[in-house]
Amino acid sequence: MKRLVLETTAPFQGLPELVAFDEGLFQREGLQVEWADREPATAKMIQANLTSPSEVDPFASHGRLFEQGQADMYNACEWGNYCRVQATGKSGRQVGRRAIVTYSALVVAPHSPVFTPQQLANRVIGVPFYFGTHYIALHMLEGFLPRHEIKLCSAPNGSRYRLAALLSGEVDAVTLTEPHITLAEKKGCRTISSAFFHGTE
C-alpha cells in the first residue's frame, strides 16, 4: 500500500478528502493516507502592522510541512498556490483544481456603520495573506473602491479566529468561510459581499 502524507485540511476546502478518509475510500484504492497537522504553528491573532503579503511568509500555513519534507501534498486556494509554486524550495507544483469550490463572505460586526462595500473605504479589513479569502476580498472590493482605499491587514488562518477578532473590535471587517459565515450572521453580523473561489492540490 502506498503511503501518502497530507497536510490537514478543513471541510470548507477539503470535504471530499475528509469523507474519502473517513469512509476508507483511499484504502480501497491502495493508499494509506496520514495527516500532518499544520495548525499548531500558525498565527492565531491579528497583526495590524502587517499590511502587505510581502511582509509575511507564503508558507506560514499551507505548504509549510511540505516545504519541510513532512508532507507529500496540500491543498489551498489557487491564487495563493501560484505564489507558493513560484517560491517553493522543494519543486512543489499544482497538480489540478481541488474537488470543491469555496464560498466566502466579507462580513462586518453587528453595530458597524458599514452596509455597502463602498463604505469599507479606508477601513481595516483582516485577511490571511496568500489565502483565497485574501484574494477574494480584493476581487469583491475592487469593483467598488480604488485599490489605495482598500486597507488590508494580516489576520489568522481560520475563520473562527477572524470572527473573534471582528467581534472584539480589532478590525472593521473580515473575510469568512462556512460554517463561520452562518455563525457570524446568527451573532448579528452582516454580510457585505460574497463570492466563490477555486483551490488546487
Whereabouts are the PLM-identified features?
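Pocket-lining segment of extracytoplasmic ligand-binding domains
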Residues: 161-201
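Short, glycine-/small- and polar/acidic-enriched structural segments
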Residues: 2-145, 149, 153, 172, ...
